[in-house]
Protein backbone atom coordinates (compact mmCIF):
# COMPACT_ATOMS: atom_id res chain seq x y z
CA UNK A 1 0.00 0.00 0.00
CA UNK A 2 2.08 2.95 -1.27
CA UNK A 3 2.40 6.11 0.73
CA UNK A 4 3.50 9.59 -0.17
CA UNK A 5 4.84 11.87 2.58
CA UNK A 6 4.09 15.56 2.88
CA UNK A 7 6.04 17.85 0.53
CA UNK A 8 7.35 21.01 2.09
CA UNK A 9 7.05 23.91 -0.34
CA UNK A 10 5.48 21.84 -3.19
CA UNK A 11 4.14 24.05 -6.07
CA UNK A 12 1.27 23.44 -8.49
CA UNK A 13 2.44 23.05 -12.11
CA UNK A 14 -0.56 25.12 -13.31
CA UNK A 15 -1.27 27.95 -10.84
CA UNK A 16 2.28 28.00 -9.40
CA UNK A 17 0.72 28.24 -5.93
CA UNK A 18 1.04 25.92 -2.96
CA UNK A 19 -0.38 22.52 -3.81
CA UNK A 20 -3.83 21.96 -2.39
CA UNK A 21 -5.39 18.49 -2.56
CA UNK A 22 -2.74 17.56 -5.15
CA UNK A 23 -3.21 15.04 -7.97
CA UNK A 24 -0.81 13.84 -10.69
CA UNK A 25 -1.74 13.31 -14.33
CA UNK A 26 -0.37 10.46 -16.44
CA UNK A 27 1.91 12.95 -18.22
CA UNK A 28 3.68 13.53 -14.91
CA UNK A 29 2.44 17.03 -14.02
CA UNK A 30 1.13 17.60 -10.49
CA UNK A 31 -1.43 20.28 -9.72
CA UNK A 32 -4.35 21.20 -7.49
CA UNK A 33 -7.71 19.51 -8.04
CA UNK A 34 -9.32 22.92 -8.49
CA UNK A 35 -7.00 23.58 -11.45
CA UNK A 36 -8.52 20.64 -13.40
CA UNK A 37 -10.68 21.59 -16.42
CA UNK A 38 -13.24 18.98 -15.30
CA UNK A 39 -14.37 18.56 -11.69
CA UNK A 40 -12.84 15.46 -10.09
CA UNK A 41 -15.02 12.81 -8.56
CA UNK A 42 -13.65 10.76 -5.65
CA UNK A 43 -10.14 11.83 -6.52
CA UNK A 44 -10.16 10.53 -10.13
CA UNK A 45 -11.55 11.53 -13.57
CA UNK A 46 -14.22 9.19 -15.00
CA UNK A 47 -12.72 6.69 -17.40
CA UNK A 48 -15.14 7.68 -20.22
CA UNK A 49 -13.88 11.21 -20.35
CA UNK A 50 -10.79 12.57 -22.01
CA UNK A 51 -8.49 14.67 -19.79
CA UNK A 52 -6.88 17.78 -21.19
CA UNK A 53 -3.80 18.51 -19.04
CA UNK A 54 -3.93 22.25 -18.12
CA UNK A 55 -0.12 22.45 -18.41
CA UNK A 56 0.95 20.56 -21.53
CA UNK A 57 -2.54 20.30 -23.14
CA UNK A 58 -1.81 16.65 -23.87
CA UNK A 59 -4.87 14.56 -24.48
CA UNK A 60 -4.65 11.06 -23.12
CA UNK A 61 -7.27 8.46 -22.45
CA UNK A 62 -6.71 7.49 -18.85
CA UNK A 63 -8.11 4.80 -16.64
CA UNK A 64 -7.97 6.43 -14.17
CA UNK A 65 -6.45 9.63 -15.36
CA UNK A 66 -5.48 11.09 -11.99
CA UNK A 67 -3.50 9.70 -9.06
CA UNK A 68 -4.15 11.44 -5.77
CA UNK A 69 -1.03 12.77 -4.04
CA UNK A 70 -1.90 12.89 -0.34
CA UNK A 71 0.31 15.66 1.00
CA UNK A 72 -1.81 16.64 3.98
CA UNK A 73 -0.67 19.04 6.68
CA UNK A 74 3.04 19.73 6.88
CA UNK A 75 4.91 16.80 8.45
CA UNK A 76 1.96 14.34 8.27
CA UNK A 77 1.51 11.27 6.08
CA UNK A 78 -1.74 10.10 4.53
CA UNK A 79 -2.92 6.84 3.05
CA UNK A 80 -3.04 6.95 -0.74
CA UNK A 81 -5.86 4.42 -0.91
CA UNK A 82 -8.23 5.96 1.64
CA UNK A 83 -6.88 9.48 2.04
CA UNK A 84 -6.85 9.05 5.80
CA UNK A 85 -4.11 10.00 8.21
CA UNK A 86 -1.62 7.27 9.07
CA UNK A 87 -1.72 6.09 12.69
CA UNK A 88 -0.51 2.48 12.58
CA UNK A 89 2.42 0.35 11.39
CA UNK A 90 2.34 -3.31 10.31
CA UNK A 91 5.42 -5.18 11.59
CA UNK A 92 4.89 -8.12 9.21
CA UNK A 93 4.65 -6.12 5.97
CA UNK A 94 6.57 -3.05 7.21
CA UNK A 95 3.70 -0.83 5.95
CA UNK A 96 2.04 2.30 7.29
CA UNK A 97 -1.72 1.89 7.87
CA UNK A 98 -4.72 4.12 8.30
CA UNK A 99 -7.80 3.10 10.28
CA UNK A 100 -9.41 1.47 7.23
CA UNK A 101 -6.22 -0.40 6.29
CA UNK A 102 -5.89 -1.70 9.83
CA UNK A 103 -9.42 -3.14 9.75
CA UNK A 104 -8.91 -4.63 6.29
CA UNK A 105 -8.42 -8.38 5.78
CA UNK A 106 -4.77 -8.03 4.73
CA UNK A 107 -3.57 -7.15 8.21
CA UNK A 108 -6.02 -8.89 10.53
CA UNK A 109 -3.54 -11.55 11.63
CA UNK A 110 -0.51 -9.24 11.59
CA UNK A 111 1.31 -7.47 14.40
CA UNK A 112 -0.02 -3.92 14.09
CA UNK A 113 0.71 -1.13 16.53
CA UNK A 114 0.61 2.62 16.85
CA UNK A 115 3.33 4.53 15.06
CA UNK A 116 4.87 5.84 18.28
CA UNK A 117 4.99 2.33 19.74
CA UNK A 118 6.20 0.70 16.52
CA UNK A 119 8.95 3.23 15.98
CA UNK A 120 10.46 2.81 19.45
CA UNK A 121 12.36 -0.47 18.78
CA UNK A 122 13.73 1.05 15.59
CA UNK A 123 14.72 4.18 17.46
CA UNK A 124 16.38 2.03 20.11
CA UNK A 125 18.27 0.09 17.45
CA UNK A 126 19.28 3.33 15.75
CA UNK A 127 20.39 4.79 19.07
CA UNK A 128 22.33 1.61 19.80
CA UNK A 129 23.98 1.77 16.41
CA UNK A 130 24.59 5.49 16.88
CA UNK A 131 26.25 4.86 20.24
CA UNK A 132 28.35 2.09 18.70
CA UNK A 133 29.39 4.38 15.86
CA UNK A 134 30.21 7.17 18.30
CA UNK A 135 32.23 4.74 20.41
CA UNK A 136 34.02 3.45 17.32
CA UNK A 137 34.67 6.99 16.15
CA UNK A 138 36.01 7.97 19.57
CA UNK A 139 38.21 4.88 19.68
CA UNK A 140 39.59 5.67 16.22
CA UNK A 141 40.20 9.27 17.25
CA UNK A 142 41.92 8.07 20.44
CA UNK A 143 43.99 5.63 18.41
CA UNK A 144 44.85 8.40 15.97
CA UNK A 145 45.82 10.63 18.88
CA UNK A 146 48.01 7.91 20.40
CA UNK A 147 49.66 7.17 17.07
CA UNK A 148 50.19 10.88 16.51
CA UNK A 149 51.85 11.05 19.91
CA UNK A 150 54.06 8.08 19.02
CA UNK A 151 54.86 9.73 15.72
CA UNK A 152 55.77 12.95 17.49
CA UNK A 153 57.99 11.01 19.89
CA UNK A 154 59.71 9.28 16.97
CA UNK A 155 60.13 12.57 15.13
CA UNK A 156 61.54 14.14 18.30
CA UNK A 157 63.94 11.22 18.68
CA UNK A 158 65.04 11.56 15.07
CA UNK A 159 65.55 15.29 15.52
CA UNK A 160 67.56 14.60 18.68
CA UNK A 161 69.65 12.00 16.84
CA UNK A 162 70.24 14.46 14.01
CA UNK A 163 71.56 17.01 16.49
CA UNK A 164 73.62 14.28 18.16
CA UNK A 165 75.14 13.24 14.83
CA UNK A 166 75.87 16.85 13.91
CA UNK A 167 77.47 17.49 17.31
CA UNK A 168 79.46 14.23 17.17
CA UNK A 169 80.88 14.92 13.73
CA UNK A 170 81.50 18.54 14.66
CA UNK A 171 83.49 17.37 17.70
CA UNK A 172 85.30 14.87 15.50
CA UNK A 173 86.16 17.59 13.00
CA UNK A 174 87.29 19.85 15.83
CA UNK A 175 89.43 17.08 17.30
CA UNK A 176 90.93 16.25 13.92
CA UNK A 177 91.57 19.94 13.33
CA UNK A 178 93.21 20.26 16.74
CA UNK A 179 95.39 17.21 16.12
CA UNK A 180 96.30 18.63 12.73
CA UNK A 181 97.33 21.93 14.32
CA UNK A 182 99.34 20.14 17.03
CA UNK A 183 101.09 17.95 14.48
CA UNK A 184 101.92 20.90 12.25
CA UNK A 185 103.15 22.81 15.31
CA UNK A 186 105.45 19.93 16.25
CA UNK A 187 106.77 19.80 12.70
CA UNK A 188 107.30 23.55 12.74
CA UNK A 189 109.16 23.31 16.06
CA UNK A 190 111.37 20.52 14.72
CA UNK A 191 112.03 22.62 11.65
CA UNK A 192 113.06 25.55 13.88
CA UNK A 193 115.38 23.34 15.92
CA UNK A 194 116.95 21.95 12.76
CA UNK A 195 117.72 25.47 11.50
CA UNK A 196 119.03 26.46 14.91
CA UNK A 197 121.38 23.50 15.14
CA UNK A 198 122.41 24.02 11.52
CA UNK A 199 123.36 27.63 12.27
CA UNK A 200 125.34 26.47 15.28
CA UNK A 201 127.04 23.81 13.21
CA UNK A 202 127.91 26.25 10.41
CA UNK A 203 129.22 28.73 12.97
CA UNK A 204 131.59 26.15 14.46
CA UNK A 205 132.82 25.08 11.05
CA UNK A 206 133.36 28.69 10.04
CA UNK A 207 135.39 29.32 13.18
CA UNK A 208 137.56 26.29 12.49
CA UNK A 209 138.06 27.28 8.86
CA UNK A 210 139.11 30.78 9.98
CA UNK A 211 141.57 29.36 12.53
CA UNK A 212 143.07 27.04 9.96
CA UNK A 213 143.31 29.92 7.49
CA UNK A 214 145.30 31.95 9.98
CA UNK A 215 147.70 29.08 10.59
CA UNK A 216 148.12 28.52 6.87
CA UNK A 217 149.02 32.16 6.38
CA UNK A 218 151.54 32.12 9.27
CA UNK A 219 153.21 28.99 8.02
CA UNK A 220 153.39 30.36 4.50
CA UNK A 221 155.20 33.40 5.88
CA UNK A 222 157.61 31.23 7.90
CA UNK A 223 158.45 29.25 4.82
CA UNK A 224 159.67 32.49 3.19
CA UNK A 225 161.99 33.43 6.10
CA UNK A 226 165.79 33.00 5.88
CA UNK A 227 167.23 29.92 7.50
CA UNK A 228 168.79 31.88 10.35
CA UNK A 229 165.43 33.39 11.33
CA UNK A 230 163.52 30.16 10.87
CA UNK A 231 165.99 28.22 13.02
CA UNK A 232 165.84 30.76 15.80
CA UNK A 233 162.24 29.81 16.55
CA UNK A 234 162.54 26.18 15.52
CA UNK A 235 160.75 24.80 18.56
CA UNK A 236 157.93 27.30 18.28
CA UNK A 237 157.62 26.61 14.60
CA UNK A 238 157.57 22.85 15.19
CA UNK A 239 154.74 23.23 17.67
CA UNK A 240 152.79 25.24 15.14
CA UNK A 241 153.30 22.54 12.57
CA UNK A 242 151.89 19.86 14.80
CA UNK A 243 148.46 18.75 13.52
CA UNK A 244 145.58 19.24 15.86
CA UNK A 245 142.80 16.74 15.52
CA UNK A 246 139.62 18.53 14.52
CA UNK A 247 136.54 17.18 16.26
CA UNK A 248 133.71 17.66 13.81
CA UNK A 249 130.60 18.99 15.53
CA UNK A 250 127.24 17.22 15.03
CA UNK A 251 125.07 18.88 12.43
CA UNK A 252 121.92 17.66 14.24
CA UNK A 253 121.90 16.33 17.79
CA UNK A 254 120.93 12.65 18.37
CA UNK A 255 118.01 13.78 20.51
CA UNK A 256 116.61 15.87 17.68
CA UNK A 257 117.13 13.03 15.20
CA UNK A 258 115.18 10.70 17.53
CA UNK A 259 112.31 13.18 17.77
CA UNK A 260 112.18 13.49 13.97
CA UNK A 261 112.16 9.72 13.47
CA UNK A 262 109.46 9.17 16.08
CA UNK A 263 107.21 11.78 14.52
CA UNK A 264 107.96 10.42 11.06
CA UNK A 265 106.77 6.95 12.10
CA UNK A 266 103.57 8.39 13.53
CA UNK A 267 102.87 10.38 10.37
CA UNK A 268 103.45 7.32 8.19
CA UNK A 269 100.68 5.42 10.03
CA UNK A 270 98.12 8.25 9.69
CA UNK A 271 96.72 7.19 6.28
CA UNK A 272 96.25 3.60 7.47
CA UNK A 273 94.63 4.76 10.70
CA UNK A 274 92.24 7.05 8.84
CA UNK A 275 91.43 4.33 6.30
CA UNK A 276 90.72 1.83 9.09
CA UNK A 277 88.60 4.41 10.91
CA UNK A 278 86.62 5.14 7.75
CA UNK A 279 86.09 1.44 7.03
CA UNK A 280 85.03 0.73 10.61
CA UNK A 281 82.63 3.66 10.54
CA UNK A 282 81.08 2.54 7.26
CA UNK A 283 80.93 -1.05 8.48
CA UNK A 284 79.29 0.04 11.71
CA UNK A 285 76.70 2.24 10.01
CA UNK A 286 75.88 -0.13 7.15
CA UNK A 287 75.92 -3.42 9.05
CA UNK A 288 72.52 -4.83 9.91
CA UNK A 289 72.34 -6.01 13.51
CA UNK A 290 68.86 -7.44 13.03
CA UNK A 291 67.37 -10.15 15.18
CA UNK A 292 68.48 -13.68 14.34
CA UNK A 293 66.41 -16.61 15.64
CA UNK A 294 66.75 -20.37 15.35
CA UNK A 295 64.68 -22.11 12.68
CA UNK A 296 62.93 -25.17 14.21
CA UNK A 297 62.25 -26.65 10.75
CA UNK A 298 66.00 -27.15 10.28
CA UNK A 299 66.85 -28.41 13.78
CA UNK A 300 68.34 -31.89 14.18
CA UNK A 301 66.33 -34.27 16.41
CA UNK A 302 69.29 -34.18 18.82
CA UNK A 303 68.72 -30.51 19.58
CA UNK A 304 66.20 -28.81 21.85
CA UNK A 305 65.24 -25.21 21.09
CA UNK A 306 63.92 -22.71 23.62
CA UNK A 307 60.44 -21.25 23.17
CA UNK A 308 61.83 -17.89 22.10
CA UNK A 309 64.08 -19.68 19.54
CA UNK A 310 67.13 -17.97 20.98
CA UNK A 311 68.83 -20.92 22.65
CA UNK A 312 69.71 -24.48 21.61
CA UNK A 313 71.05 -27.36 23.71
CA UNK A 314 72.09 -30.91 22.97
CA UNK A 315 70.08 -33.92 24.14
CA UNK A 316 71.03 -37.59 24.05
CA UNK A 317 67.43 -38.65 23.51
CA UNK A 318 66.43 -37.85 19.97
CA UNK A 319 63.10 -36.12 19.58
CA UNK A 320 60.29 -37.37 17.38
CA UNK A 321 60.06 -34.49 14.92
CA UNK A 322 58.11 -34.30 11.65
CA UNK A 323 60.24 -35.02 8.61
CA UNK A 324 61.21 -32.02 6.53
CA UNK A 325 63.55 -31.53 3.56
CA UNK A 326 65.01 -28.60 5.50
CA UNK A 327 65.86 -30.62 8.61
CA UNK A 328 69.44 -31.76 9.31
CA UNK A 329 69.88 -35.43 10.11
CA UNK A 330 73.15 -36.84 11.33
CA UNK A 331 74.95 -33.77 12.59
CA UNK A 332 73.39 -31.86 15.54
CA UNK A 333 72.81 -28.73 13.46
CA UNK A 334 70.26 -25.91 13.38
CA UNK A 335 70.18 -22.89 11.08
CA UNK A 336 69.35 -19.33 11.95
CA UNK A 337 66.69 -17.17 10.37
CA UNK A 338 66.50 -15.07 8.28
CA UNK A 339 68.86 -15.93 5.46
CA UNK A 340 70.89 -13.29 3.65
CA UNK A 341 71.54 -12.69 -0.05
CA UNK A 342 73.08 -9.21 0.20
CA UNK A 343 74.40 -6.63 2.60
CA UNK A 344 76.39 -6.70 5.83
CA UNK A 345 75.09 -8.49 8.90
CA UNK A 346 76.34 -9.45 12.33
CA UNK A 347 75.17 -11.42 15.35
CA UNK A 348 76.61 -12.81 18.59
CA UNK A 349 76.41 -16.21 20.24
CA UNK A 350 77.04 -17.06 23.87
CA UNK A 351 78.97 -20.33 24.16
CA UNK A 352 78.60 -22.85 26.98
CA UNK A 353 80.32 -26.22 26.54
CA UNK A 354 79.69 -29.31 28.61
CA UNK A 355 82.37 -31.84 29.51
CA UNK A 356 83.86 -33.13 26.27
CA UNK A 357 81.42 -30.99 24.34
CA UNK A 358 81.86 -28.60 21.47
CA UNK A 359 80.08 -26.26 19.11
CA UNK A 360 80.25 -24.82 15.61
CA UNK A 361 79.43 -21.20 14.75
CA UNK A 362 79.43 -19.56 11.32
CA UNK A 363 77.39 -19.40 8.12
CA UNK A 364 76.26 -21.99 5.60
CA UNK A 365 75.07 -21.94 2.01
CA UNK A 366 71.45 -22.72 1.19
CA UNK A 367 72.36 -25.79 -0.89
CA UNK A 368 74.38 -27.53 1.84
CA UNK A 369 73.77 -31.27 2.26
CA UNK A 370 71.28 -31.94 5.05
CA UNK A 371 70.73 -35.68 4.80
CA UNK A 372 73.14 -38.58 4.81
CA UNK A 373 76.88 -38.05 5.08
CA UNK A 374 77.69 -34.43 5.83
CA UNK A 375 80.95 -32.56 6.13
CA UNK A 376 82.06 -29.31 7.67
CA UNK A 377 84.23 -27.49 5.15
CA UNK A 378 84.16 -24.37 3.03
CA UNK A 379 84.17 -26.58 -0.07
CA UNK A 380 80.80 -27.97 1.06
CA UNK A 381 79.40 -24.52 1.79
CA UNK A 382 80.19 -24.25 5.50
CA UNK A 383 82.24 -21.28 6.71
CA UNK A 384 82.55 -21.77 10.46
CA UNK A 385 84.84 -22.34 13.43
CA UNK A 386 84.66 -25.49 15.54
CA UNK A 387 85.31 -24.91 19.23
CA UNK A 388 85.93 -27.63 21.81
CA UNK A 389 88.05 -28.21 24.89
CA UNK A 390 90.33 -30.51 22.90
CA UNK A 391 90.81 -28.56 19.69
CA UNK A 392 89.69 -25.43 17.86
CA UNK A 393 89.85 -25.17 14.09
CA UNK A 394 88.38 -23.39 11.08
CA UNK A 395 86.41 -25.27 8.41
CA UNK A 396 88.89 -24.63 5.63
CA UNK A 397 90.01 -27.49 3.40
CA UNK A 398 92.14 -28.84 4.98
CA UNK A 399 91.17 -27.49 8.39
CA UNK A 400 93.15 -24.71 10.02
CA UNK A 401 94.11 -25.11 13.68
CA UNK A 402 93.30 -22.10 15.82
CA UNK A 403 95.80 -21.42 18.62
CA UNK A 404 93.26 -20.08 21.09
CA UNK A 405 94.34 -19.78 24.71
CA UNK A 406 90.75 -20.31 25.84
CA UNK A 407 87.29 -20.92 24.43
CA UNK A 408 85.56 -17.55 23.83
CA UNK A 409 82.52 -17.12 26.02
CA UNK A 410 80.86 -15.07 23.29
CA UNK A 411 81.53 -15.35 19.56
CA UNK A 412 80.68 -12.59 17.10
CA UNK A 413 79.95 -13.29 13.43
CA UNK A 414 80.28 -10.54 10.79
CA UNK A 415 79.04 -11.33 7.27
CA UNK A 416 79.80 -9.12 4.27
CA UNK A 417 77.94 -10.78 1.41
CA UNK A 418 79.18 -8.63 -1.48
CA UNK A 419 82.80 -8.78 -0.27
CA UNK A 420 82.56 -12.54 0.31
CA UNK A 421 83.84 -12.16 3.84
CA UNK A 422 82.95 -14.06 7.01
CA UNK A 423 84.79 -12.85 10.11
CA UNK A 424 84.54 -14.52 13.51
CA UNK A 425 85.88 -12.85 16.63
CA UNK A 426 85.88 -12.95 20.38
CA UNK A 427 82.97 -10.60 21.06
CA UNK A 428 84.26 -9.73 24.54
CA UNK A 429 87.87 -8.88 23.67
CA UNK A 430 87.31 -8.02 19.97
CA UNK A 431 90.22 -10.33 19.19
CA UNK A 432 89.86 -11.98 15.74
CA UNK A 433 89.38 -15.75 15.63
CA UNK A 434 89.33 -16.42 11.89
CA UNK A 435 88.27 -14.73 8.65
CA UNK A 436 87.02 -16.60 5.57
CA UNK A 437 87.27 -15.33 2.01
CA UNK A 438 84.30 -16.83 0.19
CA UNK A 439 82.25 -16.48 -2.97
CA UNK A 440 78.51 -16.73 -2.35
CA UNK A 441 76.12 -17.74 -5.13
CA UNK A 442 72.87 -17.93 -3.19
CA UNK A 443 71.34 -17.33 0.19
CA UNK A 444 73.46 -17.98 3.28
CA UNK A 445 72.18 -18.69 6.78
CA UNK A 446 73.58 -18.46 10.31
CA UNK A 447 74.92 -21.93 11.19
CA UNK A 448 75.04 -23.56 14.62
CA UNK A 449 76.00 -27.01 15.86
CA UNK A 450 76.38 -28.25 19.43
CA UNK A 451 77.14 -31.65 20.93
CA UNK A 452 77.53 -33.43 24.25
CA UNK A 453 75.29 -33.00 27.28
CA UNK A 454 75.60 -29.63 28.96
CA UNK A 455 76.57 -27.82 25.77
CA UNK A 456 74.42 -24.85 24.81
CA UNK A 457 74.42 -21.89 22.42
CA UNK A 458 72.41 -18.72 23.04
CA UNK A 459 71.86 -15.90 20.56
CA UNK A 460 72.45 -12.45 22.03
CA UNK A 461 71.38 -9.00 20.94
Swiss-Prot record:
Taking the record's annotation, the residue ranges forming a coiled coil are: 123-230
Please tell me whether the keyword Cytoplasm is annotated for this protein: yes
SMART domains on file: BBOX, PRY, RING, SPRY
Which CDD domains does the record match to this protein? SPRY_PRY_TRIM15 (cd15826)
Which stretches make up the B30.2/SPRY domain? 272-461
Q: Where in the cell is it found?
A: Cytoplasm; Nucleus; Cell junction, Focal adhesion
Indicate what this protein is called per its UniProt record: E3 ubiquitin-protein ligase TRIM15
Amino acid sequence: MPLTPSHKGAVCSDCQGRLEDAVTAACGHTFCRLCLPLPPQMGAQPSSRVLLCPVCQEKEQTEPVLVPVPLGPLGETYCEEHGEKIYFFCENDAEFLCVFCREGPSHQAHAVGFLDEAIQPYRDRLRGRLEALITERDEIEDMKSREDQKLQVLLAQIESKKRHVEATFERLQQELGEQQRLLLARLTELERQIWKERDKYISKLSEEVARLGTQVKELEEKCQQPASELLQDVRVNQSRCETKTFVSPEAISPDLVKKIRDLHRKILTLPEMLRAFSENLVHHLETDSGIVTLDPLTASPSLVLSEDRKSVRYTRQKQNLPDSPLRFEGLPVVLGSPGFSSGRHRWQVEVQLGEGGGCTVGVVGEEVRRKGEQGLSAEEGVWAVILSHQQCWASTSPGTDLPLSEIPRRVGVALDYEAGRVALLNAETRAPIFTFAASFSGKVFPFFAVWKKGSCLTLKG
